[in-house]
Design a protein with these regions (language model features):
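Low-polarity contexts
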Residues: 18-48, 53, 79, 123-316, ...
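Short polybasic/polar patches that bind polyanions
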Residues: 58, 90, 101, 119, ...
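Short, non-transmembrane cytosolic segments of multipass membrane proteins
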Residues: 7, 12-17, 85-121, 290-324
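Alpha-helical solenoid scaffolds that mediate protein-protein interactions
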Residues: 71-74, 103, 277
Length: 396
């Protein structure tokens, strides 16, 4: 049908593409993309909308190049610039997938691979619709986790605010009282509390620098393959958070793999893309092992089972998919099942986090109160003892 027309079929003749080529040469070959300065980039949410609209326009019979120009006119900023450049590449004879591949910051590997498969199979419209659906589900999953984490995050921020106020304002007041009353031996907990309070009040820059240093160290560690593997392994085993992280990764793996296979992307290339986008080095290593073994002719489910990185339900369902020739459908079912499990895991996580955070706040505040009032109780007891002795002496 019309939707199956490839970009090369819609590309103008060489005569019409020459001015565009000259214009490109005149503008210079350097393309600086600085997203933080508002550079040319399409955000994920906007890309989903553009993909859905592009599928609709192509499905309505509009040629690809014209559809891109229609979308370009509807957009502003970085998205309009990228769409304009993609259209320009197609005008010069490039395939749609080739044009997209030149803008990796806007179009991820999975996007380019699926478009390429759609071009080869003459089903660009259906592939774009599938891509849009995939991105919508991915965004929905991320949104659920973010919204679930919003309340605990607010509670943590409030806790930090309360504790900072106590340490910076309340503790120094008590410290002055102790000094004015010339309290001698303070309990060890009180001394520790006063030292922390002075550090926060007088050398707050050291605390900020320490936190900043930890963030940088974490960023650097995630760039090194070995340390990233260790960090990702710890993430999967984290108390409360671990189940949510592992289920989210399995859901992403299954959904991405299913979408790629359904779109006609070759199995080895699909595994490569899934490995690069899964977001966890432990699972990525397992997928890499699967890819290497599949290249040698082995079945996927057997290798998955041997890696130990995937739950038995996943490997069994994929085994059934291999036997029946419907692995894409089975992967979709795995993704649906695990996305539902993510919802349950997130609900369990938030219900557990709330009381834990309250208990933690109570313990810290309790420690502060006891540390501050122990010297006062000691002073009160010594004063009452002194008053009693004085009263006894007066009676004699």
């Amino acid at each position: 049908g019309k939707s199956a027309a490839t970009p090369k079929q819609q590309a103008p003749s060489k005569q019409t593409s020459k001015p565009a080529a000259k214009k490109k040469a005149a503008s210079g070959g350097i393309n600086i993309n600085l997203p933080f300065l508002g550079g040319s980039k399409i955000k994920q949410k906007e890309l989903t909308i553009i993909t859905r609209q592009l599928a609709t326009l192509i499905g309505s019979g509009l040629p690809l190049l014209r559809a891109l120009k229609v979308l370009e006119q509807q957009r502003k900023g970085g998205a309009a610039k990228v769409l304009s450049k993609v259209a320009s590449e197609i005008e010069q004879g490039a395939l749609f997938s080739e044009a997209l591949a030149k803008f990796p910051s806007s179009f991820p590997k999975i996007y380019v691979a699926m478009v390429k498969a759609g071009e080869a199979g003459g089903a660009l419209e259906s592939v774009l619709s599938r891509l849009a659906e995939f991105m919508e589900k991915e965004a929905k999953l991320k949104g659920k986790i973010k919204s679930a984490m919003a309340y605990p995050a607010v509670v943590v921020v409030v806790m930090i605010g309360i504790l900072t106020f106590i340490m910076v304002k309340i503790v120094p007041t008590f410290t002055k009282i102790f000094e004015d009353m010339e309290v001698g031996d303070l309990p060890a907990t009180t001394v520790l509390l006063i030292k922390i309070s002075k550090l926060m009040a007088e050398r707050s820059y050291l605390i900020v620098a320490f936190i900043f240093g930890l963030v940088i160290l974490y960023r650097v560690a995630t760039k090194i393959k070995f340390t990233k593997y260790l960090i990702d392994k710890v993430k999967l085993r984290l108390f409360i958070f671990g189940p949510v992280i592992s289920k989210t990764i399995i859901a992403r793996f299954a959904r991405t793999f299913a979408t790629l296979i359904t779109s006609g992307v070759p199995i080895l290339q699909s595994l490569q893309i899934v490995r690069d986008t899964v977001g966890n080095e432990v699972i990525a290593n397992a997928i890499n092992e699967i890819r290497n073994r599949v290249r040698e002719g082995e079945g996927i489910s057997g290798i998955m089972l041997r890696t130990g990185a995937f739950p038995p339900m996943v490997t069994n369902m994929i085994a059934v998919g291999e036997e029946t020739g419907a692995m894409d459908a089975m992967l979709e079912k795995v993704a649906d099942a695990y996305e539902a499990e993510v919802d349950a895991a997130v609900a369990a996580m938030t219900s557990m986090l709330e009381p834990i955070l309250i208990v933690c706040l109570g313990v810290v505040v309790g420690f502060i109160v006891i540390s501050l009032f122990m010297p006062l109780i000691k002073i009160a007891l010594s004063l009452s003892g002194g008053a009693g002795e004085g009263g006894g002496g007066g009676g004699e």
